């Protein structure tokens, strides 16, 4: 039974909050730190690469989910320390991508691939 609500990403954030809950969460998840989770993040990125190399779309989808979980995990760790949260991560990458693509989002005309 799914006890979470909202969009799938909201549900994933709620799931991580539950896993990290100080008294009702998972003992393993509660003990994790940025440093202890980092190797899993790298491992998941390599698993995405492997699934892409195998052209296995089902595995790509699954591994991207595992990688997304790592981002949500790190964001939750940061939120608990008052550093930032998942929404801030998303806002920052949105801003960065818009700034890096003035030819798409700005007043500049469309550029060819050679000029990008």
Task: Map each language-model feature to its residues.
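An amphipathic alpha-helical micro-motif enriched in hydrophobic residues
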Residues: 41-49, 54-79, 87-94
């Amino acid at each position: 039974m799914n006890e979470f609500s909202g969009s799938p990403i909201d549900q994933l954030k709620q799931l991580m909050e539950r896993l990290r809950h100080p008294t009702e969460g998972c003992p393993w998840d509660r003990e994790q730190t940025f440093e202890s989770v980092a190797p899993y993040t790298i491992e998941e990125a390599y698993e995405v690469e492997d699934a892409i190399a195998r052209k296995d779309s089902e595995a790509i989808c699954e591994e991207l989910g595992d990688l997304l979980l790592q981002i949500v995990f790190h964001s939750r760790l940061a939120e608990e320390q008052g550093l930032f949260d998942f929404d801030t991560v998303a806002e920052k990458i949105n801003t960065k991508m818009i700034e890096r693509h003035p030819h798409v989002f700005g007043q500049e005309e469309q550029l060819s691939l050679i000029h990008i």
